[in-house]
């Protein structure tokens, strides 16, 4: 299954649950696999699938510091114009509060405010703005 993107009926992505569960069941052991997949990602599907896996790992209690170590790899996508990539990155940064990620979040928010994403079925600035507020709280 490829990623099913948000549409007029659903404002979130759908992933291959079995594939994601198999990967995230490895917990910390999944991180090198995810990092390699992100470094070699060829398309948005590959990127957001692995960002989603990181979000799930964080939701399941993985040590935030372990995810913070992936920041150099995650930062590769900080300039993305994709609302999907921006939303997943903002979610990760919101949960980890990686200090170096604050500036890129502000940049995303400003860029999206000036040039809102077109053909998006949700507003990524909600997640980005929420992440920024969590940094400031």
Predicted regions: what they are:
Residues 10-26, 36, 45-64, 76, ...:
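Structural detector for internal amphipathic alpha-helices that build alpha-solenoid repeat scaffolds
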Residues 1-5, 25-39, 61-77, 98-116:
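Amphipathic alpha-helical scaffolding segments comprising HEAT/armadillo-like alpha-solenoid repeats
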């Amino acid at each position: 299954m490829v990623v099913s993107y948000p549409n007029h009926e659903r404002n979130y992505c759908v992933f291959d649950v079995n594939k994601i569960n198999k990967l995230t069941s490895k917990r910390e052991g999944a991180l090198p696999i995810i990092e390699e997949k992100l470094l070699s990602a060829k398309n948005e599907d590959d990127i957001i699938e692995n960002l989603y896996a990181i979000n799930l790992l964080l939701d399941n209690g993985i040590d935030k510091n372990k995810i913070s170590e992936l920041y150099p790899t995650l930062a590769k996508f900080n300039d993305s114009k994709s609302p999907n990539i921006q939303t997943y990155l903002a979610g990760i940064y919101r949960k980890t509060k990686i200090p170096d990620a604050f500036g890129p979040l502000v940049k995303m928010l400003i860029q999206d405010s000036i040039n809102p994403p077109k053909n998006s079925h949700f507003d990524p600035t909600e997640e980005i703005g929420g992440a920024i507020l969590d940094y400031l709280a």
